[in-house]
């Protein structure tokens, strides 16, 4: 397994409110965590870095080695982090702070993930890009209800309004998923600064191109910047090879 992480401020923003990192626990199991923060001043930067780092530090200390244990860990620790960031957000300096969150662990040939907000996790297998997560956003709710067409959703002025985040008052309702991995698969975690700028077919073409993994993440970010770079752009790309998928 090979992992490449990259974050970029984009073309329009002055600070980067995204954060990404990966961690390995005592059982040698890898977890990748990506967050896209929100809130005025530096609140968004703090929320995203805090969520990623707190969860990562907690993960490193575990011996977790099964998919079921990961799921229980997600359910417990994500809500703890939600409340922690919500409490901090009561302080005037951090008013409105929150963050999206994508957390993905790899156990043998399985990936298990938790999703909150409108960052995304995708699987690139063969010649196809499959979006594994469904955005927790107002526009996606309207789309699913048949009140918007995909084209209208794409250009909707309220596209950035999310319906769930880490740091909200109410208990979070994360989406959980698992995927059985095959040799040659790629997993992509990204903030919306990537997928608002480039299409699934462009992602697929870049990820399946014959260049080193780090060059693929750089190319994804470059394409998003060339398309306008309207937001921070963050990607975590995982390549599964023969041994991982057995």
UniProtKB/Swiss-Prot annotation:
<feature type="domain" description="PPM-type phosphatase">
    <location>
        <begin position="2"/>
        <end position="240"/>
    </location>
</feature>
<dbReference type="GO" id="GO:0005737">
    <property type="term" value="C:cytoplasm"/>
</dbReference>
<dbReference type="InterPro" id="IPR001932">
    <property type="entry name" value="PPM-type_phosphatase-like_dom"/>
</dbReference>
<comment type="similarity">
    <text>Belongs to the PP2C family.</text>
</comment>
<dbReference type="GO" id="GO:0004722">
    <property type="term" value="F:protein serine/threonine phosphatase activity"/>
</dbReference>
<dbReference type="GO" id="GO:0046872">
    <property type="term" value="F:metal ion binding"/>
</dbReference>
<dbReference type="GO" id="GO:0007165">
    <property type="term" value="P:signal transduction"/>
</dbReference>
<keyword id="KW-0479">Metal-binding</keyword>
<protein>
    <recommendedName>
        <fullName>Protein phosphatase PhpP</fullName>
        <ecNumber>3.1.3.16</ecNumber>
    </recommendedName>
</protein>
<dbReference type="Pfam" id="PF13672">
    <property type="entry name" value="PP2C_2"/>
</dbReference>
<keyword id="KW-0963">Cytoplasm</keyword>
<dbReference type="InterPro" id="IPR036457">
    <property type="entry name" value="PPM-type-like_dom_sf"/>
</dbReference>
<feature type="binding site">
    <location>
        <position position="37"/>
    </location>
    <ligand>
        <name>Mn(2+) 1</name>
    </ligand>
</feature>
<keyword id="KW-0378">Hydrolase</keyword>
<feature type="binding site">
    <location>
        <position position="192"/>
    </location>
    <ligand>
        <name>Mn(2+) 2</name>
    </ligand>
</feature>
<feature type="binding site">
    <location>
        <position position="231"/>
    </location>
    <ligand>
        <name>Mn(2+) 2</name>
    </ligand>
</feature>
<keyword id="KW-0904">Protein phosphatase</keyword>
<feature type="binding site">
    <location>
        <position position="36"/>
    </location>
    <ligand>
        <name>Mn(2+) 2</name>
    </ligand>
</feature>
<dbReference type="InterPro" id="IPR015655">
    <property type="entry name" value="PP2C"/>
</dbReference>
<comment type="function">
    <text>Protein phosphatase able to dephosphorylate StkP-P and other phosphorylated protein substrates. PhpP and its cognate protein kinase StkP appear to constitute a functional signaling couple in vivo, PhpP's primary role being probably to control phosphorylation levels of StkP and of its targets. PhpP thus performs an essential control of StkP activity.</text>
</comment>
<feature type="binding site">
    <location>
        <position position="36"/>
    </location>
    <ligand>
        <name>Mn(2+) 1</name>
    </ligand>
</feature>
<keyword id="KW-0464">Manganese</keyword>
């Amino acid at each position: 397994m090979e992992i490449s992480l990259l974050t970029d401020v984009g073309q329009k923003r002055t600070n980067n409110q995204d954060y990404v990192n990966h961690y390995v626990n005592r059982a040698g199991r890898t977890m990748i965590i990506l967050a896209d923060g929100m809130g005025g001043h530096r609140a968004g930067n703090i929320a995203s870095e805090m969520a990623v780092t707190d969860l990562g530090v907690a993960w490193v200390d575990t011996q977790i080695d099964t998919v079921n244990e990961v799921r229980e860990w997600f359910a417990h620790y994500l809500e703890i982090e939600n409340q922690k960031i919500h409490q901090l957000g009561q302080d005037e300096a951090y008013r409105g702070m929150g963050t999206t969150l994508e957390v993905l662990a790899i156990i043998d040939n399985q990936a298990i993930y938790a999703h909150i907000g409108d960052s995304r996790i995708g699987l690139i297998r063969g010649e196809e890009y499959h979006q594994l997560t469904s955005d927790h956003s107002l526009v996606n709710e309207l789309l699913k209800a048949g009140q918007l067409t995909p084209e209208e959703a794409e250009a909707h002025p309220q596209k950035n309004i999310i319906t769930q985040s880490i740091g909200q008052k109410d208990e979070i309702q994360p989406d959980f998923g698992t995927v059985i991995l095959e040799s040659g698969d790629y997993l992509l975690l990204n903030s919306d600064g990537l997928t608002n700028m480039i299409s699934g077919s462009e992602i697929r073409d870049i990820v399946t191109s014959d260049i080193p993994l780090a060059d693929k993440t750089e190319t994804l970010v470059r394409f998003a910047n060339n398309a306008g770079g309207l937001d921070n752009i963050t990607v975590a790309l995982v390549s599964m090879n023969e041994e991982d998928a057995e």
